[in-house]
């Protein structure tokens, strides 16, 4: 086996306490996630992870939906604990009986242990069966008074690695208005007011990532003024988006064809933000005109 460590979080707890929100939060944090994992399969799955160079941060939901849960969970945990390559923690989500009943009434779903349809009986039985596992858990979160956003933030605070920004990513993209607005954009900025390199013959076939085009776009006084205001607008609001529990913020910058001005601006913005935040840069339409010409 590899001597590289696996960071494993087992997510468990009361049905209706927020495990779906939790596993989605771990996915946003960059964990490899599986919901409703049968306990007997966990050790074999971890062996496969150890043999690859894939993501070694793993979050697994193991709960009462697996009917053989308690016949296997203790041996599974013993197996994990005896493996020096695995660092694991248990996150147990709980809520009051009254809150769980209320949530089940709202969703109109049946409780996995309510054989006769009585939700409260199922909750009480589940609480009794889960009591030993709860006592073993390193993290117990009472979600009774938590909104989904607050639960996501709680998980981010406890399980994100590195800086505060680890659970928050900024997507900076360029696009061409002639090809339509990006549907996933949160913030859209229009730079069509800037001088267009398209009308410079020597720049027409290049993109905003080419040095001469980039310098042409960013050297105009209008560009300098707008870029300064753009940073002053975006930078202060990023912590607020993160605080609200948003995992990805997409900032889109558009020009006519998405080849020159928007590409240069998006590249410049991405580089500036990357000093303090996790940033991905993409250019949706920078080669669109060339592809159209080639097909014609």
UniProtKB/Swiss-Prot annotation:
Pfam families: PapZ_C, RapZ-like_N
The UniProt record lists the keyword Transit peptide: no
GO molecular function: ATP binding; GTP binding
Record: residues binding GTP: 63-66
Keywords: ATP-binding, GTP-binding, Nucleotide-binding
Gene3D superfamilies, per database record: P-loop containing nucleotide triphosphate hydrolases
Ligand binding (ATP): 13-20
Highest taxon of source: Bacteria
Keyword ATP-binding: yes
InterPro entries: P-loop_NTPase, RapZ-like, RapZ-like_N, RapZ_C
UniProt record similarity statement: Belongs to the RapZ-like family.
Task of the protein: Displays ATPase and GTPase activities.
Protein name as catalogued: Nucleotide-binding protein M28_Spy0517
Upper lineage: Bacteria, Bacillati, Bacillota, Bacilli, Lactobacillales
């Amino acid at each position: 086996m590899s001597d590289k460590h696996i960071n494993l979080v087992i997510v468990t707890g009361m049905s209706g306490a927020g495990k779906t929100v939790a596993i989605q939060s771990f996915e946003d944090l960059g964990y490899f996630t599986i919901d409703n994992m049968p306990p007997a399969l966990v050790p074999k799955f971890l062996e496969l992870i150890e043999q690859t160079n894939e993501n070694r941060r793993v979050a697994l939901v193991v709960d009462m939906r697996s009917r053989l849960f308690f016949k296997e969970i203790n041996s599974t945990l013993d197996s994990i604990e005896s493996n020096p390559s695995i660092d694991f923690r248990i996150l147990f989500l709980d809520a009051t009986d009254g809150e769980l009943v209320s949530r089940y009434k709202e969703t109109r779903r049946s409780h996995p242990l309510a054989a006769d349809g009585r939700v409260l009986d199922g909750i009480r039985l589940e609480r009794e069966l889960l009591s030993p596992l709860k006592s073993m858990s390193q993290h117990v979160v009472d979600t009774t008074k938590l909104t989904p956003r607050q639960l996501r933030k709680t998980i981010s605070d406890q399980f994100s690695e590195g800086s505060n920004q680890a659970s928050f990513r900024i997507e900076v993209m360029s696009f061409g208005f002639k090809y339509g607005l990006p549907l996933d954009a949160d913030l859209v900025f229009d730079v069509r007011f800037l001088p267009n390199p398209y009308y410079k013959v020597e720049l027409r076939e290049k993109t905003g990532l080419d040095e001469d085009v980039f310098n042409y776009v960013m050297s105009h006084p209008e560009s300098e003024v707008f870029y300064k205001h753009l940073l002053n607008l975006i930078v202060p609001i990023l912590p607020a988006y993160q605080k609200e529990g948003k995992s990805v913020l997409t900032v889109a910058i558009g020009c006519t064809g998405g080849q020159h001005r928007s590409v240069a601006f998006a590249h410049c913005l991405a580089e500036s933000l990357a000093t303090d935040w996790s940033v991905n840069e993409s250019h949706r339409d920078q080669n669109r005109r060339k592809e159209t010409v080639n097909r014609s």
